[in-house]
Amino acid sequence: MILIDTSAWVEYFRATGSIAAVEVRRLLSEEAARIAMCEPIAMEILSGALDDNTHTTLERLVNGLPSLNVDDAIDFRAAAGIYRAARRAGETVRSINDCLIAALAIRHGARIVHRDADFDVIARITNLQAASFR
């Protein structure tokens, strides 16, 4: 499975032409069946909708992908552990939400496609499979 982080989705939605946007477009055309969503990413994507039409379009996208479910008893604690491990290693993770997304990806064996330095840090200190397009 492939999780596309909000950082890469935003590049795609804005049609920036960045390497992240190009990779998301490639994944959607060549590996669509492998793309999954998770609620933390859905929350970030949907919170960026400025109008109802955009929100409706984004809801269709989010709801049209298989979802990697959050297991509260496992994933939130794993996210806290990732955050603490980064701090112990002298690394900075700016978003605890990225730790939660990483915990989900690790548990589900999914690869994260991103444009976010947090996932580079997390991949260095865990077994997160991450493809950076920064």
Curated annotation (Swiss-Prot):
EC numbers for this chain: 3.1.-.-
UniProt key word RNA-binding: no
Positions of the PINc domain: 2-126
SUPFAM superfamilies (alphabetical): PIN domain-like (SSF88723)
Induction profile: Induced during infection of mouse macrophages.
Family of the protein in this entry: Belongs to the PINc/VapC protein family.
Protein's name according to its UniProt entry: Ribonuclease VapC11
Organism: Mycobacterium tuberculosis (strain ATCC 25618 / H37Rv)
Domain of life: Bacteria
Gene Ontology annotations of biological process type: negative regulation of translation; response to host; symbiont-mediated perturbation of host process
Record lineage: Bacteria, Bacillati, Actinomycetota, Actinomycetes, Mycobacteriales
Gene expressing this chain: vapC11
Keywords annotated in UniProt: Hydrolase, Magnesium, Metal-binding, Nuclease, Toxin-antitoxin system
GO molecular function: magnesium ion binding; RNA nuclease activity
Residues involved in Mg(2+) binding: 5, 98
Cofactor field: Mg(2+)
